[in-house]
Amino acid sequence: SVIVQSGNENIATVSQENHAYGGGDITESHVYQTGDLNSATVTQNNSKDSISEVFQVGGYNTANVIQIDSGSSVSNILQNGNDNIANVTQTNSAYSESIITQTGDSHLATVNQSGASQISLITQSTNAAIATHSQSGGAGNSATTLQY
C-alpha cells in the first residue's frame, strides 16, 4: 500500500486483511491525493489479487472502494476537480473491474458489482453528472457510461 498526500487535511484509510483467498497474495492499494480535504477509504478483504488505485486532485473529493473476497477485483478511480464522489463495491469477484474518471466538479459515480467477470467504465466531465452501475448475477457483463 502506498499513500502520497500533498495539501491540507487529506484523509486516507486503507484496510487489507487475510490474504487467504486462493492461497493468498497481492493486495495493493495506491492512494495519491493533491489538494485539500480529500478523503479516500479502501477496504480489501481475502485477496489473491484485489488492486485499487485512487488519484484525487482538487478539493473535497471522496473515494470509497470495497473489494471483498477477490480472486481479482480491480478498481481505478481518477478524480480531478472539486466535490466529486466515487463509490465502488465489488463482492465475491473472480474478476471484476471498475474504472471511474471524473473531471470537473460535483460528480457522483457509484458502481456495485457481484458475480463473475463484471466490467464497468464511467467517464464524467463538465459538472454535476450522476452515474450508477449495478451488475449482479450472471457473468461477463459490461457497462459503459460517458457523460460530457
Residue ranges and their predicted role:
Residues 1-148:
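Low-complexity repeat regions of mature extracellularly deployed or surface/particle-associated proteins
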